C-alpha cells in the first residue's frame, strides 16, 4: 500500500499535543482508553483533523479486546460497544490468560468464529 499508513499510539491517554498530531498527521490511532473516555479523545482528534483540512472520518481507530482473563465473559458486548462508538479496527487479545501456544491459536479461532456481526 502506498504510502504506508501511519498509525500513532500513546501509553494511556494521549496528551493534547499527541491528539493534535494524530488529527494532523496520522491515518489512525491505537486507542488505549476506556469506552467512556473515547468520545472526548475522538472529538479532540477529529477537531485537529478538521483544522488541518483533513476528513476526520478518514481516520482509523483500533481498540483491543481481551477474549481471555477476567473480562472473558463480556468480550462480545465490548466489541459491539466499541463498534457503536466508532471503532474501525479491532485487536482480539489472548495474552494474560495463561495459555499455551496452541491454546492461544484455538482461542483466537473460537473468538473469530463467535465475533459479533456489527
What are these regions (language model features)?
Residues 1-118:
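Active-site-adjacent structural elements that line small-molecule/cofactor binding pockets in enzymes
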